[in-house]
Swiss-Prot record:
Its main location: membrane. Residues 250-401 form the GAIN-B domain. Orphan receptor. Residues 20-409, 466-486, 540-566, 633-635 are extracellular. This is Adhesion G protein-coupled receptor F4. GO terms for cellular component: membrane. The gene is Adgrf4. The chain crosses the membrane at residues 410-430, 445-465, 487-507, 519-539, 567-587, 612-632, 636-656. It holds the Pfam family 7tm_2. It comes from Mus musculus. Glycans are attached at N61, N168, N213, N268, N290, N344, N375, N466, N559. Expressed in squamous epithelia. One of its GO terms (biological process) is pharyngeal arch artery morphogenesis.
Amino acid sequence: MKPWIAMVCCLVFFLTTECSHSKPKTHRKDEDKFQISLQKHEFRPRQGKCDGLCSSSSSCNQSCPWNFRGEIVFTCNQNKWQKTIETCTSLSVDTLFQRIHPAASLSLASSSVFPMSLIGNAAPVHIGNVFQGIQKYCPEDYVCIVDAVKSSAVTSGNIAFIVELLKNISSNLQTSGIHDNVNWKKMKNYGKVANHILGPTAISNWAFIANKNASSDLLESVNSFAKKLQIQGKSESIVDELFIQTKGSRISHSSSEHSLSLSVPRYNATEDVLVVIEIPRQALQELSFNASQAIVVAFPTLGAILKEVHRPNTSLQKPIDDLILSLVLPEGLNEIILTFDKINKSQSTSSQCVSWDPATGQWDESPCTVMSDINSTVKCRCRHTKAVTSFSILMSSKPVKNTILNHITFIGLSISIFSLVLCLVIEAIVWSRVVVTEISYMRHVCIVNIAVSLLTANVWFIIGSNFSANVQEDHKWCVAVTFLCHFFFLSLFFWMLFKALLIVYGILVVFRRMMKSRMMAIGFAIGYGCPLVIAVITVTVTEPGEGYTRKDACWLNWNQTKALFAFAIPALAIVAVNLLVVLAVAINTQRPLIGSSKSQDMAIVFRISKNVAILTPLLGLTWGFGLTTLLEGVHLVFHIIFALLNAFQGFFILLFGTIMDHKIRDALRMRVSSLKGKSRAAEKVSLSPANGSRILNR
């Protein structure tokens, strides 16, 4: 079956008033089992040196109980020790499979290591081995890891371990060449593992995990796993745990309308919450004719966990609710209608739906609007609008998702593409008049190839943005697009390097000139040969392990293989060389005459400024700001400056490299005058008496 998933929307409904905290009547047996399992493996921190009074700005590390690995970190707050990080874990690769195979001691090759920061002083746990163990012992249903997870204490360290476990399972399905679809047994047991760390006892422990993105990682991992789920019947309830529920339904283009209802039990409410997902008829008709499916995953407590870990939204006017719905929708479906039961029906409260943005760790109101808010139900219309990938991703070690950056990128690239096309048209018009000498010929060859490389790179960058929401399903296409982007952006830089070398050649060599054919050969070898070698080596080395592209965008990988260095290092090295060339030009331009007047000095300053302004976009000096975006946690303003300067580079090339060149302007005027002269001559010929007599003689 062809890949059909194009979008995952994470939506949450919340009220303006706090809800009651009474326990539910439903799932009472499951709740009792949950409490019993916790009592079996009670976690009791040791009494030790991190007790009593303390001095401000001090910290204290305390070892975990004897049957746990890791440590507990305390910091002093108002003269009292306060727990900040806890990495105590009892889970490991061996303990997961001990019940299935007591003598199991997995020593399989692994590409994913559990971060040291999450387990304190324990040895690194090769989480990648877990998936290989699953493939060995229980590939059909994943049941072999469920008991070990459910019997473990819900410590912060174990929560982090389980999140990494679920994340690894999901990513291995996508990237390890194992493309089997997820059946209902796998989804059910995967849900049981996730359910263990979503209970009310676990909520407060999420705050002490070193990785503050763990809750968001869990949400994305479950979504990624649910993407592979194949629904067999018309409507199926797959996972029905206390803290996670999954339901799927088949949908088709021919349906008049479609709805999917889900009754979600609430741990802190007396009644279940009924959620109805409707797909409008018009949205269904826009789908492809092949039958598809929609999947909803409900997390009754994940909203509370996200609130516990992430900072509150200052822009939202209402307190957030705990229920989160993840919707896995087919390709082309951009609109849905959500109907929720209000939790507290006795109060008159206003409500709204929002979407979770994992990049910013914030809720976003823009995708959803409230259609009705009457009595006990709320109805919202939610649309999925895919934004263009931010231009700052080209140098960034971590993609920055921001509306301002997206707008700058979209507007800048549109203007740049138009400007570069216009630049090439002008070059074609004036070519015969401006390429008089070898140096002028090579100068315009450089400008044309710089424009062609940047134009092609920008077009492929936009195409790559359209794959960013579905990178895993379109992996081969994403690799191809990334390779072309990589090659043409490198070609841009190497042609700018060759132009800088031509400038140095013109300054240093006055009387002796190189043959045009030799200069052309050197130019194309540098401009296209070097980038091709770098791009081919990069994809050859990294792609066998599927580490060439990012997991969330069609661009060079950073986290696993550092393939981004294959672009950043050559680009920044060329920028450094070109900066030295600009300084050399500035020094060469400022030769003052003896006894020169103040006006002559000002003319020199103006000439230097003009040369620097012209050479800056043509030699790519604006890309020097990319050095700041390579650093994690850098302020958004640097990304904005980088996007502004480089998204508009095509416009700057047209302005400073073409329009401000007086020879090109003169050639254009001559061309226009020549065309006007020809048109006048044609008019005179058509209106001449001789021509008129010939017409009459016919």
